[in-house]
């Protein structure tokens, strides 16, 4: 896909200036390389995805999740179909392998957007988990960046999904149960709607985003993060929700679209005593633009349809050096 008009204009920006700035500390692992290339995935290097969480029900891994701040984890609502009692759950952070580690966080509360028993195609498959005590951030435990509510992720953008799920249909993750990663590309909504037909057209809902590999998320990856790199930091575009099988042709993985719920996330975190600065997000730059650059950026906003415009090989173009 060729560069969009927004991409062409951004290339004219002065060095070191971009449309967005990042809150320090989010989405920047100290391991710079994403590693090898979950179904069709590879073992992730230690520290590559420091926001990755393992949600466990009575010490057994049931879902993935992502750390938003020292006390909040994002996951999927359907992960809580086994119990709604917060004391039944533990959250493990900073771990590469699924082990019976004695180091874990207990859960203060679970906030669901929808019923955990919802069927595939049900909107609102997202949940927040408040930890009983804030975790200490380190090179192995860091938050992911959140998008803005108005953000979109264009078809063809290459992102990554991580988890401890099945490596293919019917095949659980083998020992040593290491975190796996796989690269996927965002699929345009109309194609995904055709791939998942239903009464009245499609079972795909507006709050859903699709991505395919050849790799894919699978059972036990639910709730885990789909992240895309923006200006050198990783931003969560979606949470693993559902799909028909794992890695099947014309059956992309379906994710809950995180931008659709950023305001919901903010509202519940602040209502529970947190501050808006208590979790990372991507604020728009408020100023410091040269007059000529300002005109270019205004034109970009008017012409662009998505947050990210892929380059010719489908990857986001980088921020200016």
Swiss-Prot record:
Cystines in this chain: 26-145, 63-79, 159-228, 192-210, 218-246
Subcellular location(s): the record lists:
Membrane
**UniProt xrefs under Pfam families:** Trypsin
* Gene Ontology cellular component terms for the protein in this record: extracellular space; plasma membrane
SUPFAM superfamilies attached to this UniProt entry? Trypsin-like serine proteases
Q: Which UniProt keywords apply?
A: Disulfide bond, Glycoprotein, Hydrolase, Membrane, Protease, Serine protease, Signal, Transmembrane, Transmembrane helix, Zymogen
GO terms (BP aspect): proteolysis
The encoding gene is TPSG1
Name-wise, this protein is: Tryptase gamma
Under the heading InterPro entries, the entry gives:
Peptidase_S1_PA, Peptidase_S1_PA_chymotrypsin, Peptidase_S1A, Trypsin_dom, TRYPSIN_HIS
